[in-house]
Each structure stands twice: as structure tokens, then as C-alpha cells.
């Protein structure tokens, strides 16, 4: 059975000067998930948006909202984003004092829980937590800024995650610098969900999403071959 590739536009490139960024919704652009980047100017050197923006967007899209916490600490924000309408929360293990507790807090609220690994973070960080996770986010750029170039070392990490017992995690996703050429290479070793920053800035979002999805699916074809 062919794996389904899902595309997650990132709100980081949305135009917040308008009253409400035009959210992709089911059937209009082909997006599958809305990726919500949260930066605190402590864990990463940038500052973005918080739970109030998530709550304001929630009524305007039926897509699942995946909150990516690039914050330290993690735990105080979990309840706030759960109440704001998040469906998934992903955090960086280096930013949590007790990773298991953070995961348990997320799942107790009925949300999917994920861990994000920076480009230099080893997969061994997952060895004692993977069975409790719903997803793993592989960073193919360093967190904190948009517009960075894809870091190729993400590819062997994705392949290793997709094999053996590590595949117990249901959703392997990649965030950072993903263009159509990268999407093809990422899907082949096992990425299921691709986070794309530039979609909100595209003049034709449906076309931008179709381009990424088509490239990724061509990578799956090469995998099958």
C-alpha cells in the first residue's frame, strides 16, 4: 500500500497585516494540516505568535492545527494551546525538564504529542520515549528563522527513523527549507508529512501544494521501483 503524503503549510510566512491570514481549508488548496510555529525569543532567537492567535484562527479552518513549540519552558503553554484549539503539540526535548511529563500532559488533554529533533540532535533522544509519541518532527533547518536552506543530513535520520522499532511512531514529518526537489528526496526514505513555509506567500497556494505533493509522490514511486 502506497504511503499517503500530507502537506502542512506553515503560518510563519502568513501575512498578519490583514485581519486574518487566509487559512487553507479542506477542498480549496489541498493542504492537510496547518503548522503553527511558536517562538519565544529564549529557546530560539525569534518571537512569533501565541495561543490567542491560534484561538482566533481555529473557527476559520477545519484542518488539524499542529503547534510546534520552540519555547523554553514547554509545560506552561500546553494547556493554553489545548484550550486554543490545537490538535497536536510538538516540542523540543532539550527545552523540557521532564520529557515524559510534557508528553503525558499533551496526551491527557486529548491531543497528539510529538517531539522535534534539531539537525544536530541524535535519534537516540527518542530511545525511551518513542512508544509514547504520535509523531516525530525532523528539523531540516535550525529552528528560529524561516528562509534557511535544507540541511541534507536530515535524510539519513529520516531513513533510520522509518526502519525497525523506530517506525512505531505513526507520523514522521520534516520541517525546514522543503522545496519540490527536497520533497522527492525526503519522501523516499520515509517522511509522511512535509512542512512548507513558502505556501502562504505563494500567489497560487493550491498550485504550490500540488507541486510539493507531486514531487514527494514521485519519490515514493522511486522507492517502489
Curated annotation (Swiss-Prot):
It catalyses: D-ribulose 5-phosphate = D-xylulose 5-phosphate. A divalent metal cation binds at residues 35, 37, 68, 175. The active site is at residues 37, 175. The keyword Lipoprotein does not apply. Substrate binds at residues 10, 68, 144-147, 175-177. PROSITE patterns: RIBUL_P_3_EPIMER_1, RIBUL_P_3_EPIMER_2. It is an enzyme of class 5 (isomerase). Keywords: Calvin cycle, Carbohydrate metabolism, Isomerase, Metal-binding. InterPro entries: Aldolase_TIM, Ribul_P_3_epim, Ribul_P_3_epim-like, RibuloseP-bd_barrel. Its cofactor is a divalent metal cation. Gene3D superfamilies: Aldolase class I. One of its GO terms (molecular function) is metal ion binding. Its EC number is 5.1.3.1. Binds 1 divalent metal cation per subunit. GO terms for biological process: pentose catabolic process; pentose-phosphate shunt; reductive pentose-phosphate cycle. Pathway: Carbohydrate degradation. Belongs to the ribulose-phosphate 3-epimerase family. Catalyzes the reversible epimerization of D-ribulose 5-phosphate to D-xylulose 5-phosphate. This is Ribulose-phosphate 3-epimerase. It comes from Rhodospirillum rubrum. The gene is rpe.
Amino acid at each position: 500500500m502506497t504511503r499517503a503524503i500530507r502537506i502542512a503549510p506553515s503560518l510563519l510566512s502568513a501575512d498578519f497585516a490583514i485581519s486574518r491570514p487566509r487559512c487553507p481549508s479542506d477542498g480549496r488548496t489541498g493542504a492537510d494540516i496547518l503548522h503553527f510555529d511558536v517562538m519565544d525569543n529564549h529557546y530560539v532567537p525569534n518571537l512569533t505568535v501565541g495561543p490567542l492567535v491560534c484561538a482566533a484562527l481555529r473557527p476559520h479552518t477545519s484542518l488539524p492545527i499542529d503547534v510546534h513549540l520552540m519555547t523554553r519552558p514547554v509545560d506552561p503553554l500546553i494547556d493554553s494551546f489545548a484550550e486554543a484549539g490545537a490538535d497536536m503539540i510538538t516540542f523540543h526535548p532539550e527545552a523540557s525538564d521532564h520529557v515524559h511529563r510534557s508528553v503525558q500532559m499533551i496526551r491527557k488533554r486529548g491531543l497528539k504529542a510529538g517531539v522535534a529533533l534539531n539537525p544536530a540532535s541524535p535519534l537516540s533522544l527518542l530511545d525511551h520515549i518513542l512508544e509514547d509519541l504520535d509523531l516525530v518532527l525532523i528539523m531540516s533547518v535550525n529552528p528560529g528563522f524561516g528562509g534557511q536552506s535544507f540541511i541534507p543530513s536530515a535524510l539519513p535520520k529520516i531513513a533510520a527513523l522509518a526502519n525497525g522499532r523506530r517506525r512505531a511512531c505513526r507520523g514522521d514529518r520534516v520541517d525546514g527549507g522543503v522545496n519540490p526537489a527536497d520533497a522527492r528526496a525526503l519522501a523516499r526514505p520515509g517522511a509522511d508529512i512535509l512542512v512548507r513555509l513558502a505556501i502562504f506567500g505563494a500567489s497560487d497556494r493550491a498550485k504550490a501544494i500540488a507541486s510539493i505533493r507531486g514531487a514527494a509522490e514521485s519519490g515514493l514511486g522511486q522507492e517502489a521501483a
